[in-house]
Amino acid sequence: MDFHLTEGQVTVRELAGGVFGRHGDAQHLAEVEAGEDRFDRRLWRDLADAGVLGLTVPAEYDGAGLGLSEVALALTEQGRRVCLVPLWETVVLGALALVRYGTDKQRSTWLPRVADGSAVLAAALEDPGAGRPWAPRVRATGSDDGWTLTGTGTAVPYAHVADAVLVPASTEAGSVELFLVETGQAGVVRARYERTDRGVAADLVLDAAPAERLGDGLDEDRLDWLLQRAWVGLAAIQLGVSQESVRQTAGYLSQRHQFGVPLATFQAAAHQAANCHIDTQAMEVTFWNALWRLETGRPAAAAVHVAKWWSAEGGDRVARTVQHLHGGIGADVTYPIHRYMLWASQLANTLGSAGWHLHQIGRHIAGGTA
């Protein structure tokens, strides 16, 4: 088995890393966080110009026609630089679903705009009151005039700037389908608030809001298809966050002296840093296993939950440890390492906590599908 990236994947990683790197200095990140939208639109334009936003968009819609692996590499680079742009939301949650399930009209309407950066997409996949993401509380009502949705999509990332949001909803027939809701319509209210990572999310309050069903509908298996890719995308970002925070901490421990010697020579500090490295290695191998299974059509459900569990558990542990290893300066909320802790905490609890995913792993073990 060849574990090396292809030449094309290396190119994507280097391209995305270069673009994010030009916008990832601490001063610029702080300026974006102080802005009204918490959305780096200059970076978004550069990502579009570089072709990163069109990675999964088919060539006939002005994209590169690549897969989830290439997007995951770009997401990892975003995590390294903790840049506030809706790459996961637009490309994974939005474009992938449109490519897979959208009608020709839906694809021609949205995919070229995704590729050129003129459209932002999001998805309302958080539904804490439902107990499980496969049973959404938003209700869809069909009529001769089309579909309308009523209910609230909770904590929708970047909904405040999204042109359209994908919303899973339960129909009167008892099925679960995915709908596309344009945010500028009547019956749509966005109640925004700041997230832990200093970005912005919004509750999407729908009151008989006009909606368009995605393709021919979305049953539970198809919703699971989208959720699995969403979880792997989150694991990709968290991997970048953790790897970069460990790298920065290693540099700090080597440069910072105490009692005339580098902190890295202290066994207690070295052991904690080594544990962080082990966590990131476990995060990486489980992430790639889940991604490989998804890309090759193998059973992936249990592997995806394992990857997301490591992303949540390991990522949060790494974030808190590296902040502790920075000593007093780690408590400074303006110091760069603090931003990585905030991102790790946000990612760890997005679309299910470590405990929730551990429960799903247990279900797969008990059911013989792990």
Give the ranges of each region predicted by the language model.
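A structural signal for short hydrophobic beta-strand segments in well-ordered beta-sheet cores
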Residues: 138-142
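N-terminal glycine-rich flavin-associated loop
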Residues: 85-104
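Glycine-rich phosphate/cofactor-binding loops in nucleotide/flavin-utilizing enzymes
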Residues: 2, 12-13, 328-370
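Glycine-rich beta->alpha junctions and the first turn(s) of the following alpha-helix
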Residues: 2-14, 80, 188-281
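Amphipathic, small/basic residue-rich leader segments at the start of a protein or domain
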Residues: 1-85, 363-370
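A short, Trp-centered hydrophobic/proline-enriched beta-strand micro-motif
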Residues: 117-128
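C-terminal helix-coil-helix/basic helical segment that borders enzyme active sites and/or dimer interfaces
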Residues: 27-35, 250, 254-262, 277-310, ...
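A short core secondary-structure module
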Residues: 124, 152-188
